[in-house]
């Protein structure tokens, strides 16, 4: 058994020791190989970090830790939204040999709704997204690029 609860506590204490804000995203390694703690439990630990900017997010969305950080200026104008998405664990069957999971449609829909609302206030706003595993489209683009497709 892997004591990922203890590791999460130690990680949070370590990051808090720098006294600067930090965040994280979940991926496929957080609860694998006999880990003792699920993502929901890890999220509760991370949410307690003194300098952590982290939330478990909405329960109805696939994954844990889907949230948006709005970087603003002194007047409260959003300069850069940071989107953090759980790229989840493994595909059908739920374990390593079943293939990797992905960012799901409900997560994408939620993300776009949030960004559309920000764009309604300021059409020039751009966002950055952070997640552990790249979307399948990255692989498709990479393969096209290797074959010489300059449109990628």
Question: Which sequence ranges carry the predicted segments?
Answer:
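Active-site-proximal segments of metal-dependent phosphoesterases and phosphodiesterases across multiple
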Residues: 122-152
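Extended active-site neighborhood of metal-dependent phosphoesterases/phosphodiesterases
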Residues: 6-123
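Active-site-adjacent substrate/metal-binding segments within catalytic domains
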Residues: 1
């Amino acid at each position: 058994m892997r004591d990922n609860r203890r590791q999460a506590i130690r990680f949070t204490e370590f990051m808090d020791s720098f006294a600067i804000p930090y965040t994280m995203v979940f991926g496929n390694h957080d609860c694998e190989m006999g880990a003792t703690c699920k993502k929901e439990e890890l999220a509760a630990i991370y949410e307690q970090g003194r300098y952590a900017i982290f939330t478990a997010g909405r329960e109805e969305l696939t994954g844990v830790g889907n949230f948006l950080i709005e970087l603003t200026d002194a007047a409260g104008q959003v300069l850069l939204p940071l989107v953090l998405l759980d790229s989840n664990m493994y595909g059908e069957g739920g374990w390593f040999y079943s293939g990797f999971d992905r960012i799901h449609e409900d997560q994408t829909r939620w993300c776009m709704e949030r960004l559309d609302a920000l764009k309604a206030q300021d059409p020039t706003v751009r966002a950055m997204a952070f997640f552990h595993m790249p979307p399948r489209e990255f692989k498709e683009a990479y393969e096209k690029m290797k074959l010489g497709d300059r449109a990628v």
